[in-house]
Each structure stands twice: as C-alpha cells, then as structure tokens.
Amino acid sequence: MQIGQRLGTPLSPSATRVMLLGAGELGKEVIIALQRLGVEVIAVDRYPNAPGHQVAHRAHVIDMTDPDALRALVDAERPHLVVPEIEAIATDALAAIEAAGVCEVIPTARATQLTMNREGIRRLAAEELGLPTSPYAFAQSFDEFAAAVARIGFPCVVKPVMSSSGKGQSVVRSEADIEPAWRYAMAGGRVNHGRVIVEGFIRFDYEITQLTVRAIDPASGQTRTSFCAPIGHLQVAGDYVESWQPQPMSAKALERSRDIAHRVTSALGGRGIFGVELFVRGDDVWFSEVSPRPHDTGLVTLASQRQSEFELHARAILGLPVEPALATPAASAVIYGGLDEAGIAFEGVRDALAVPGADLRLFGKPESFAKRRMGVALATGANVDEARERAKRAAAAVRPVSAR
C-alpha cells in the first residue's frame, strides 16, 4: 500500500489499518484524527474500556510487554502501521515485526527502543550527537546510586530509566533524601528494570516542549522537518499541570531549541510528531527528553493550532501534508480525579464552559485516582496570560464526584 497516495474505506478490504499500542487520552485523540481521514483503527491497551477503546473500530486488552502476545495480535490484525503511544511495550518484538516486513512501525522500531529508555536516548543525545544536557550518571544498585549522587552533587534529580509522567521521579537535596528517593524510583518504573538516571539540577528560567514534525514534503517527496510554536509548561512532581502556547523566548533560544530538536529527531528518523523537552535559561538551552509521539503538554494544541498535534501526527504517519502554524494563544489546565473510585461523575461542566474561550476534554477513564489526570480544560485568549487564567478557572469549576 502506498501510504499518502491512497486511503481506503474502514471495515472493507480496501481499509487502511492502523494499530495504536496505548489507548489513553493522547491515543484517543490520535484515533479520532485518523478516523476523520477514513482510517480503520485498532486500539490496544493493558486495561479494558480505556479512552481510545471507546472510539476505535476494534479494541484489545493485552500485556504489551509480552512479545508473544504482541506479535500474535499484529499477525491477527495485519495493520499497515503500528503506532506506539506509550513506553511499556516489548520493543524487541516491534523490531522483529519491522525487520520481517509485516508492517511499518512509527516512527521506527529503533526510535521506539531508544526513547522508551532514558539511558538510550540520553547516550544518543549527549554522547553521539554532542547536545547540551545536564550532568548525569546511571545506577543499577543502591550503592551505585549513592555513589552517583555523591558524584553529581546536591540537588539532583533521580528518575527510573523506564517511566513516564513523573512516576518514580524525585529531587534529592540532602543525604536524608537518598534512600527514600531510591525506594520511590524502584516503585515507579513502568517496567521492572531496577535502573535509574541521576541528573544534575539545571537552574532554568522555564521548560518548553518543542513539538517537531517529520512529514513528507508534497513538493519534493522527501521528509521535511517543521516546528510548532514552543509550548511552555508547569510541572509538579514531574507531571504537567498547565501548558500554554506560545512560550515567549529570545530569538537565539528559539533557534537553539529548534536546532537541538532537529538534530535529535533526525537521528531517530521516521515520520510523525516528536515532543522534545528542553530547559531554557536566557539564550542557553539544554536537551532533557524526547517522546516519538504526541506529548501531554501538547494537549493545548487542540485550542491553539488549526491542526492539533494529534492531527499533525495522523497526517505525518500517513504521508500527508502538515501545517503546524499557530492560530491563537491558548492554554491547558489539568483536571485531576480527586478521589479513588470507578465510574465517577463530573459537576460544574456548565460553569466551566461558560468561561470565555473555554473548552473541555473529559477523557472517559473508567477508574479515577486522586492524582490521575481525568480531563483537561482548554482556553484561548488575546495573549497567553489571559488564556492561562481562563483555562485554570475552567478547570477549577469542574468537580469530580462519586457517582454512588
């Protein structure tokens, strides 16, 4: 099948089939974007009734870290594209699937392998590409960890090499923090890996996500890199609580950010959107991480861009033209579950949507936890400050409540 030249009809022999591995809120938006282009979508996750399951043509529940289960599902569904949307996947199975020519892995199996592991991507960025990063060390045992902390110095940040959304991440400020940080990291990894990265603390002015799109240029037929406006965000305990676009920054810092993003995404290859996380202080920029998929801070693009990050990803992986331009300043603010219960309800939706320029995405997750992201408020404004105030006001109006 010539991706980009021909799209079929879902649920027919001509269908263009895409399998998403990971069906959370980001995967759900990718599925919707693909379906608007007439793509047949198979959603896969580790638990039933995930947000993406609710909108896909077919849904499956498997342990995606089990290579045999993953290969069996791909063989049964025969997708044209496999699109990982989370880190906890048997990437060796994806590499075998790609090598056998069964289907294409987005962006590539190698990119998925490197980016699911903080060690792989940090060594690529710092040691192979020579990109500026914080000082770092890796540790496999508590003794190695304590030695790494002593070498890096206080304060430092510890993260499992395999985790996401801040899980297992903490700041070590003194000797008293070392043992609790190790225990927390061991409990927070998405895969039982037992290895951590210790990073020196960078005193930055702000953090950004530089969404970077690798897509086919219709004029040349070659892969071209383009950029969204920089996204600023606020993190608490490693998890995003607010994002806004555009983030004001100097011309030099923007140039350096895009150069770093271009270099790391070119090294990873393939097509699709990449979320490149960077620290910025004045004109100086440091590489932090990269995800070869839509980024949670990029939820703001549902309001800020004519083509959201999800639409850009869908178009890029299908070989279609993209347009990542900013349409309006906008912001997002997270809505947490606030309670531990299945099948919760939400009050205050009317009040939230009465905020000028506001919109909501309630993700439909079947089970709530106090700190689980259950939705997001979006808002536009004449400028970023107004958009942020509106988004926070709309998010605060939504009240998760027990449905019992």
Swiss-Prot record:
Q: Which UniProt keywords apply?
A: ATP-binding, Ligase, Magnesium, Metal-binding, Nucleotide-binding, Purine biosynthesis
| GO molecular-function terms, A-Z | ATP binding; magnesium ion binding; phosphoribosylglycinamide formyltransferase 2 activity; phosphoribosylglycinamide formyltransferase activity
Catalytic function, reaction form: N(1)-(5-phospho-beta-D-ribosyl)glycinamide + formate + ATP = N(2)-formyl-N(1)-(5-phospho-beta-D-ribosyl)glycinamide + ADP + phosphate + H(+)
What would be one Gene Ontology cellular-component term for the protein? cytosol
In the UniProt record, does the keyword Coiled coil occur? no
- The positions annotated for binding N(1)-(5-phospho-beta-D-ribosyl)glycinamide are 25-26, 85, 296, 365, 372-373
InterPro entries from the entry? Answer: ATP-grasp, ATP-grasp_carboxylate-amine, ATP_grasp_subdomain_1, PreATP-grasp_dom_sf, PurT, PurT/PurK_preATP-grasp, PurT_C, Rudment_hybrid_motif
Task: Give the metabolic or biological pathway.
Answer: Purine metabolism; IMP biosynthesis via de novo pathway; N(2)-formyl-N(1)-(5-phospho-D-ribosyl)glycinamide from N(1)-(5-phospho-D-ribosyl)glycinamide (formate route): step 1/1
- What stretches pass through the bilayer? none
Q: Which residues form the ATP-grasp domain?
A: 123-318
EC number(s): the record gives: 6.3.1.21
Residues the entry annotates as binding ATP: 118, 159, 164-169, 199-202, 207
For the biological process aspect of GO, one term held by this record is:
'de novo' IMP biosynthetic process
| Record-stated family | Belongs to the PurK/PurT family.
Summarize the subunit comment: Homodimer.
Among HAMAP family, the record links this protein to: PurT
Q: What is this protein called?
A: Formate-dependent phosphoribosylglycinamide formyltransferase
Organism this protein belongs to: Burkholderia pseudomallei (strain K96243)
